[in-house]
Amino acid sequence: MLFKDGLHGTSLHNYSFYCWLYIHIYPSLMSKNSIHKFCIAPMMQYTDMHDRYLLRLISKKVFLYTEMIATGSLIYGKCYEQLDFNREEHPVGVQLGGSDIKDLVECSKKCEQQGYDEINLNVGCPSDRVQKGKFGACLMLEPMLVSECLSNMQNAVKIPVSIKCRLGVDNHESYEFLHNFISTVKDSGTKIFVIHARNGILNGLSPRQNRNVPPLKYDYVYRLKDDFPELEIIINGGNQKFRRF
């Protein structure tokens, strides 16, 4: 899927780089009505309600996500308006950033009350600011905490709770590290995993560079699907051409 018109000072076709594409390896695990066949990733300063509404006009089937919303900002009212969305946007998920279980539970309830179809926990953003808040990609070093966060979020709401993460962080870039992380986190009951097929570099690269510099390792994600056939695995990163998958 390519978008050709401009928005927010950038070309919409650039969105294809960030799109999430479901891996069609085990079709028996995916119903005809799966809402994750094709998704637009959460993008700060881009995927607000106006952008999402435009994307919904372009496609009635794509799954949409909000920008990442930090739990602290939502709880203290600094960005509550970011929860607003047009009912025409469905299906649409909200992405939360945080690691405090109590805060995540409170925000999850707010999101469900607002009418979202899914809540996604950000464990993939490598920015310095996010690290200072102890959330994003740095949480891959604390799989037990991530699992506990997701478990409590799921117990607090009835809508699905998913996670977006990287292959690893810094020098933790082996498949074994990723496998162990997924193995621990899935015990929370989480079934939907969005995997950015790159390592996250916590120091030395900007968020923009982290979307391009670390090499793509799609084979890691394919191996995950083999090792965890019961999970819904969504691949992210460099998705410019469907035929690559």
Descriptions of predicted regions:
Residues 5, 10-11:
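Short, low-complexity intrinsically disordered segments enriched in A/P/G/S/L with frequent Arg
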